[in-house]
């Protein structure tokens, strides 16, 4: 079955405060998103439970988002969502999507150090956004990088971005496909080398993949 015939799963992943939403906003205008169910717990909390920042609404929205994702998997409907990618449940979902024949695109956004992420989350809170405790930010940062190394073997296409510099466009570092590097764009930041070190090297036969 060709890519065009498969249901699509588009995942924008990265630690809290890495800048996932900026990548998502760009993707929402791309043809890859055509026909995708965009699963956003913040929108669900706001639209179905009245407040995107209230603890109870956030909890209920997370469960509702999981239900929608599972429904798309069963019905083989294309979908897209953001995730910190720091918990086993998302890994399990991605594995099951792979087994169900979904074409998976992973967009991973990282930074040089979790202190960057913590500062951005603090700024977000000052502007009325939701908070994440610093110990969680640091713990999730490490887990997220580790899980990206695994998901890069499951995904048909993986795109890894560095977003360490505030108020600058995220920089595409490399692309991969099913565990193999496809193209490297200049120098790779040390945090991202933790991922590339677990991938197969670039093959001349794969450079046409996008």
Set out the residue ranges of the language-model regions.
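Glycine-rich phosphate-binding loop used to anchor ATP phosphates in small-molecule kinases
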Residues: 60-109, 144, 159
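Conserved lysine of the Walker
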Residues: 20
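The Walker A (P-loop) glycine that initiates the GxxxxGKT/S ATP-binding motif of P-loop NTPases
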Residues: 11-14
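Conserved substrate/cofactor phosphate-moiety recognition/catalytic segment
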Residues: 24-77
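Walker A (P-loop) phosphate-binding loop of P-loop NTPases
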Residues: 17
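NTP-dependent small-molecule kinase module
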Residues: 150-210
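Phosphate-binding P-loop
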Residues: 1-7, 72-73
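A glycine- and Lys/Arg-enriched "phosphate-lid" helix/loop adjacent to the NTP-binding pocket
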Residues: 100-149
């Amino acid at each position: 079955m060709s890519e065009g015939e498969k249901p699509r799963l588009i995942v924008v992943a990265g630690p809290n405060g890495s800048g996932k939403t900026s990548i998502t906003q760009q993707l929402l205008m791309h043809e890859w998103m055509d026909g995708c169910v965009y699963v956003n717990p913040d929108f669900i909390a706001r639209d179905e439970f009245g407040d995107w920042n209230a603890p109870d609404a956030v909890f209920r929205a997370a469960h509702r988002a999981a239900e929608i994702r599972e429904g798309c998997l069963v019905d083989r409907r294309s979908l897209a969502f953001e995730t910190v990618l720091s918990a086993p449940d998302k890994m399990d979902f991605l594995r099951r999507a792979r087994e169900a024949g979904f074409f998976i695109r992973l967009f991973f956004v990282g930074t040089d150090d979790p202190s960057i992420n913590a500062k951005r989350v603090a700024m977000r809170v000052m502007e009325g956004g939701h908070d994440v405790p610093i110990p969680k930010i640091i713990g999730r940062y490490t887990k997220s990088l580790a899980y990206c190394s695994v998901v890069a073997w499951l995904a048909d296409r993986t795109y890894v971005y560095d977003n360490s510099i505030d108020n600058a466009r995220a920089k595409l570092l490399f692309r991969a496909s099913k565990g193999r590097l496809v193209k490297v764009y200049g120098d790779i930041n040390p945090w991202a080398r933790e991922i590339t070190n677990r991938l197969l090297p670039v093959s001349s036969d794969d450079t046409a993949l996008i």
